[in-house]
Amino acid sequence: TATITLTSADIAGDPVNVSTTATCTKAGATTDLDQTTGLNRVHLRSATNKVLLAANAEGDNLAAKVYIINKSTDPSLYLTITINAQTIGKLYGGDWMFFPWSQTDTSANIEVAATNWTSATGDIPVEYALFHEDTDFLTNA
């Protein structure tokens, strides 16, 4: 089960308070996802794309959810997240994302790049986890 709560007094003209829960289930079923890579940590030292999770063609049509967080405390050090060479988002220091991952082919790798990284900025810690339904999902990180 994944829960997200958004609360803000100043994002709109009126206060915003949204909370929703989703049960992470297998594709086309009511059975919960039962596999995970566990929480992993890498220290990014590159402004070029690095494979965080490698796509597996057998993963197409199976349910998978991905969690990624930029653990940097410096808001200017952001990560660019791509799938199949398409940018899906940027995570600034402290930002995170949780999204479904459909592996349509082996080019659907999830890659990260430390966009503003230089050797002077030091490592950018990134944590991630894959929740999935099939034991054939493997990561290379």
Name these PLM-found stretches.
Residues 4, 42, 68, 79-81, ...:
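Hydrophobic beta-strand residues in large extracellular and virion-surface proteins
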Residues 86-107:
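Intrinsically disordered, low-complexity Pro/Gly/Ser/Thr-rich segments with frequent PxxP/GP/PP motifs
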Residues 1-13, 24, 116-141:
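C-terminal interaction-tip segments
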Residues 1-56:
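N-terminal low-complexity, intrinsically disordered "leader/linker" segments enriched in small/polar
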Residues 102-123:
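Noncatalytic modules at the cell exterior or secretory-pathway interfaces
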Residues 60-65, 69-88:
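Short, surface-exposed beta-strand/strand-loop-strand elements in extracellular ectodomains
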Residues 49-55, 64-70, 111-115:
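Hydrophobic beta-strand segments within beta-rich accessory/binding domains
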